[in-house]
Amino acid sequence: MLLRLELSALLLLLIAAPVRLQDECVGNSCYPNLGDLMVGRAAQLAASSTCGLYRPQNYCILGYLENERKCFTCDSRSPYNDYHNPSSHRIENIITTFQPERKMKWWQSENGVHEVSIQLDLEAMFQFSHLILTFKSFRPASMLVERSKDFGRTWKVFRYFAEDCANSFPGISEGPAHSIDDLVCDSRYSGAEPSTEGEVVLKALDPSFDIHDPYDSTIQGLITLTNLRVNFTRLLTLGDTLLTRRKRNPQDKYYYALYEMVVRGSCFCNGHASQCIPVDGARGDTFTEPGMVHGRCVCQHNTAGYNCERCQDFYHDAPWRPGGKADSDVCKRCNCHSHSEKCHFELARYLATGGVSGGVCDDCRNNRIGPQCELCGPFYYQDPQRSVDDPYACIPCDCDLDGSVDRGLCDPVNGQCVCKQNIEGERCDRCKVGFYGFSRDDPSGCQLCRCNFLGTIQVGNPCDPTTGRCICEHFAYGSQCDQCLPGYWGLGNTVYGCIPCDCDIGGALKTECSSVDGQCKCRPNMVGQKCNDPAPGYFLAPLDFYIYEAENAAPLAVISPFIGPPPFVYPTEGIPERPTKLPLCPPAPKPSSVPYREHITVQPSPAPHNPQVTLPMCEHYFRQRGYDFKISNGRLVVVKREKRQTRRRRQGQRTIPFEPGSPLQILLRQRANDQSITWTGLGFVRVQDGAGLRFTVSNIPATLDYYVVVRYEPESTDDWTAIVSILSIGSEDERCPNDQSNKMFTLPASGRTATLDLPVCLSDGNQYHVDITFRKQPSEDPHSSSFILIDSLGLIPKVESVPNFCSQSYLSQFQQYRCIELAVQAGGQTLPEVCEMLIGSMSAFIHNGAVSCNCHHVGAYGSSCSKFGGQCQCKPNVIGRCCDSCAPLTYGLGPNGCSPCDCDRSGSTTELCDQTTGQCSCRDGITGLQCNRCYPGYYGFPLCRRCQCNRLADICDPITGDCLDCREHSAGRNCERCEEGYVGDPVSGQPCEPCLCPDLNGSGRFFAFSCNKDPRSGAPYCECLPGHTGPQCDSCSPGFYGDLRLPGGRCKECCCNNNIDPRDGDACDPVTGECLRCLHNTEGPRCQSCKRGYYGNALAQDCKECSCDRRGTDDSKCPAGSPCFCDQDTGQCPCRPGVQGALCNECDDGYWNMDGDYGCQPCNCNREHALNYICDKITGQCLCQPEYGGRICDECGPNHFGNPDLQCMFCDCNLEGTVHPACDAYTGECLCKPGVTGPFCDECAPGHNNNFPACEPCHACNHLWEKIISDLSLDAERIETMMPCPEDFRSRPELQHLQNLLEKLQNVLNMGAQDELKKLEELLARIRNETEIIDPNIIIIDPTLLLNTDIDYIRLEFNKLLKNLREKAKEGPVTDIKAVNDIFNKIKKFYDEFTDSEKKVEAAKKVQEASRKTREKVTLELAKCQIGEMDKLERKVKALSAANINEEVCGAPGDAECEKAKCGGALCGKCGGPDCTGSLPISLNASKLAEMTEKNITALRSQLKEADAQLRNASEMTSYVKDQAENMMDKINRTKTKYEQEKTDTKALIEKVKTYLQDELVKPEDIEKLANAVLSIQLPKSPDEIKDMIEDIKKILANITEFNDDLEYLEKQAKIAGNMKERAKEILNRTELINVKEIEKALNDTAKLHDKIFNDLDEAEQNNDVIREKVNETEPKLKNIEDHLNLTRAKTLLDEIEALKNKTEMNRAQGKEAKDTADAALNSANDTGKDLEELKEQFEKLKLNSTNQNVSSEANERLKNITMEAENLAKHVEDKMKEIEDLEEKILLSNERKDEMRKELEALQKEADDLKKFIVDKVQRYNLCSP
């Protein structure tokens, strides 16, 4: 009954819990409480290994100090029970139960099993928090934790744990993690401490990371799981599993043992539940297990599922998501407006609504559709009077079936019908705007109005809705209003529809244009929309285009000729049949070859009755008369330069008669810069009263009426009358009848143009002569001029006569703006825009389009010209409208234009030249293209005097008059002397005769510059060439060679590279030139190489003696008794193999023992055990790995044992109780000190006290009892050992099997292997004997395992030997018999050595046996307690110890500890010291002293030999002191270098020996070997003999005074060449031996001088800054000067500017040099300051140490030198300062000069600008002439 009540209460609690939790989760996320997931899941927990699960198993523990018992039994066959089965260690024991005796139960794995796993399987998805493992045993050396989310199908690693992560889990990064999902290895939980109750903690999420979204997929992947597995991969052991000194299996104490495992987590509900209930189908005991975490969520927030992972039905309007702070938008109820009870979620709708609604209703009722059933279905629409929830709100559609589509389908919201394409209205019952013709049969309902919207009125409907007729805009027509009326275009471009055409009246053929783009129809070569622009390459002619110059007209009156220069006749050309087709730029007439003169008469065209002759074109006429044309704005400006000797009638003009006796003269008008041009052409024709001119007109463009215009200039105030007669040469044109009578009009004196009142009609196909006679009207002034100046005749078309040209309005504008008056005026006035437009249109009308430019293909830059006027763009010096002629004073039309004539004014009669050849007209006696030189035989232009050459030359230099090409072997300026190689006197008529030196000049054997006559004897003598000597120069001088007997032989300088004495006649072979007496230690046919045994640059006289170390040098290149032969260029000595260094004085890496018989020998370091192949270059010791030793690392190292080919293991001995080395290198047996025992030498031996490590001996009587107890104990242990154990019986079959294997191995390994096994057996026996005394409680290893280990080692050795044997077998048969013999000999030698060693071992065994007997005797004596005898025996034993030996060898008693023994000993790693008197330190000191003494003796002997050789050579080679001094300096330097190198090497050797002796790993036998080597060094006899030898050397050197003087002089010269910094350093060096007391005053003076130098340098720096600023100011000024340079300036000005520029550059360079000098002086002064500071410090030190010293004369001399050099330094600085000041003055003068030049350039620039402005103004006022 009570149980039933409890169940009922629990059920009520479970039912009420969701209601309470629902309130807690409203609007917020909620989570179940954390708990231990292990609780209640014992059945779901499993382990891969558990001890005693099938049978009881023993296990042992480590460090169990509470009880003597160390081994226990595990029996897990039944569950754990405190009373009945406390030894059960099943996996369920690790679940936390909170029992009082919690530590009494645990889970434990089997012994020695490394890989063990524990797995927890959960029934649902849980959220994991952290894991805690509490171990009873050591924590694992490595382990990992895995998780699964799919109930064990796949696994992922949580975290790795290892003591050594790199070896346990290679490739896994060691912590810490950088992100939440980093997979790392943690080493914090895998150490050996603590040995129990150690923990391993794993947190799912590292708290160091800031987690923003706990429901992120990455986070969920880390914290959710269905299974958890812990994998232990390696046990943590203490290294004793490989030892061979245990009787029990060490694996028994290594296993995994866990007190508890806590897996903290909770039910995973995605934030939508705070409570969980059991999962369906789970265990039935869930209600009885307190603290269990269940797996099924009690979901809130309208969610469902085990983990609340989905929404409830009909709650899909918002997507499911994990719980958060605001969960109002999670799993919302769908809104279907009461028309459905089912829905689903669509992400696309949710995104489209901006996250408002994502639910889509299913199966809508009441004609409803839509995601929320909010729309009416097809053919229904929403009744606006009803709500959406009303089941009757959708009513049927009402559409016109003729105008709607889809059978009357309407809009479901407003009921609007779906109309046809062109129908509108709610019921689709009318046409849209812009459409017409409503019809049922039309698919679109109505037709589109076909109106052009550009031409249609856009107000309302553009067409009638019934008929479709369009309503047009203005000027548009057509049924669709898509066309413009004729004369209009641009439909829709304006508000008026179309715009009128605007075609040019002359350029267009008609006024109509294209209605699309307004393009008019143009005349030929006219372009543009209006046809008002000429095409490229064409132009429009101006109104005054047809001008006929008076200079080209023919005279009407014939006057008798007068005497004058010959006339200039122009070639004639025929007149073409069609004048209208005459080119506007006809070919230029060929220029005459007759030179131009100042007065030129022109033969005019023949009489008027000869129509086939015409005057040349105006451009040619002007050009041939030396006038320059310039173009500006379509106008021609003629410029005439002033010439010397030019007769002028008036300023700016000259006259040229037409012909002899003619009353007409051509008046050339000179243009002034400031005068406007009021004429055309070259100038005027001066016509006498009554005379006339005939103008030929043959280029009429069209049959029109033309106004006749005469341009003139009166010479008086009288009016003139012009009588005009027009005569047609061809037949009369009916279209153009003319009155043949004369016409008259007045030329008023106040005007410049006159126009015939009535126009004349001229036809385009005819040629006319226009005759004009000029009459002066009567005048009251009898002195008035009877001449008038006629400029030109012009024909101006009459606008009114042009048929159908322009309207009355255009004519009114033409007259209003006085277009004709402006056009006929000369001077190039700018026309108004109206006039220019009308004239251009008329030109296009008259010429039927534009006129071709016809630009000359050579003279013009292109084919285009100016649009109005047609002026082409001419190249330099090219003129004419077509750019077809050279400008005056130029010639040679070509690709680059025309070249200037450049006629020399002094030699030419005019500045004009032939325009084809460029030949100028020269004066008498002058020739040349530019008339700038004299005729051959004359010189001195322009005076041109005859050459003076003594009749021995015909021509001379045209400038200097020096004769050229003198004959009869004469030479000189006037051929007044004989040429080289001849002798005579040409002035006096004595001929030049050849010299014989020794043969004639030109014979190939003439070796003199010339010859001469002796003034006394008159005999000729030769002046020899360099290198020749003798009366006839027939032999070579010293230092020269050559075979003068051969043709072409010469004496050439001997090429010996400055390595011979040029004064020595025998220095080189006189015939071959081979060098015979080479100096400076050189050799070779050219002394081009250093001698053998020397190296360096022979070309620079720098050959030094080789300094090779004979120990490391190849014997063949370094023979005994002679110097070594090194590389003659680099000095590299030829080293033996394994030796390196320029002097072969150092072993190469991988080699050692420089003092060996064959140089350095290889290190041969063991590749497997050495860190690298390099060893110590003195001892050969390789750098071994920590566990290896020996010279080549082929042995086990100190404190290690084993087989070095397999493995060396640490001895694990107590170093305080062992000797050195600590253990046996092969067996590992610890070698204990006396009084110490134990397998690890860690306890005191019997008979000694227990104060380890001191272990003082007990009383002597104690040995009696000790021996008795020991014997009894040994006997008991032997009896115990002989008793068989059950385990021994079990292992006998296995031992038998192993014995069989050993026999097989013995057969394979032959005798050697049997011996080794025998030794191993003996070793095992010894080990067993030694271990008898071990404490029986200590764990003993089973001997079976030991034997297995030994067999494994033997097997490895056998495999290794077998592998080597197979490799040798693969190499094939041996063919090198000698190598085989050598190997055999080596093997034999090694065998002999092995035999000797074996004998020594046998002898040692005998000694050992004798020692054993001795010990037995001692023991026997001790047993008798004979104290006196025991003391004697102790003294004898001590005498046999190493202490006395240490004292004798190292210098101090050897019984002290190594830390306290200052001199060390045999076991201390060192021997000897500073105050030690042993044999070894004495020998070391003797070695150092011997080495130093040997160096001194060697140096002194070398100096003695050199001094002796110098004495012998000094008397024989006095003339070569300089060369000998240089050689001596080289030898001294080499000797110094050699001694310094030997000193350095010796220091390095001593340092290496010191380092070697200080090394703790050095063996005593190696120290002894090194000491013997030092003692074997030969020392001098006595120090007194050394002193005597030194004194003798000093005496000998003191006698060499003359040589020392020369050497001192050379050294002084070399020192003078040094810089100031080196002098300052020398000052410091010279003060080392000076007494301070007497030079303090000089030092103070030097300090003051130092301060003064600093002040001067500061001023120099300031001046330098001023100079730098001046230079910076000069550079922009110089740039301005360069920018203002003008090419038109005279050459002298350019030269001055260039000189100024060079001067400025020089100043800049001097300024920079001064700056560099000042900087160098400043740096030097700074260095000097530093050096002086160092001097002061040195003086202060010397002051303390030199109180009793006397001042020597040498010190005084050095002091004087210091003072003198300091003064020189100050003077040098002052000189530099003065140079800087001078340079500053020069820069100032240069700046003033530049300012003057700048002002002059500015004035010239202004003058050039004014001139340019005037020229431009004049060019603009002149137009080109007509063709």
Curated annotation (Swiss-Prot):
Stretches for region Domain alpha: 1450-1476
Cleavable signal peptide: 1-21
Bridged cysteine pairs (disulfide): C267-C276, C269-C297, C299-C308, C311-C331, C334-C343, C336-C361, C364-C373, C376-C394, C397-C410, C399-C417, C419-C428, C431-C446, C449-C463, C451-C470, C472-C481, C484-C498, C501-C513, C503-C520, C522-C531, C853-C865, C855-C872, C874-C883, C886-C898, C901-C913, C903-C920, C922-C931, C934-C944, C947-C956, C949-C963, C966-C975, C978-C992, C995-C1011, C997-C1022, C1024-C1033, C1036-C1051, C1054-C1068, C1056-C1075, C1078-C1087, C1090-C1103, C1106-C1126, C1108-C1133, C1135-C1144, C1147-C1160, C1163-C1175, C1165-C1182, C1184-C1193, C1196-C1208, C1211-C1223, C1213-C1230, C1232-C1241, C1244-C1255
Null mutant phenotype: Significant defects in apical-basal distribution of Muller glia cell bodies in the retina.
Chain ranges of the Laminin EGF-like domain: 267-333, 334-396, 397-448, 449-500, 501-544, 853-900, 901-946, 947-994, 995-1053, 1054-1105, 1106-1162, 1163-1210, 1211-1257
Cellular-component GO terms for this entry: extracellular region; laminin complex
Family matches, as InterPro entries: EGF-like_dom, LAMB1-4_helical, LAMB4_dom, Laminin/Netrin_ECM, Laminin_IV_B, Laminin_N, LE_dom, LMN_ATRN_NET-like_EGF
Task of the protein: Binding to cells via a high affinity receptor, laminin is thought to mediate the attachment, migration and organization of cells into tissues during embryonic development by interacting with other extracellular matrix components. Positively regulates apical-basal distribution of Muller glia cells in the retina.
Subunit structure: Laminin is a complex glycoprotein, consisting of three different polypeptide chains (alpha, beta, gamma), which are bound to each other by disulfide bonds into a cross-shaped molecule comprising one long and three short arms with globules at each end.
Name assigned to this protein: Laminin subunit beta-4
Species: Danio rerio
Gene: lamb4
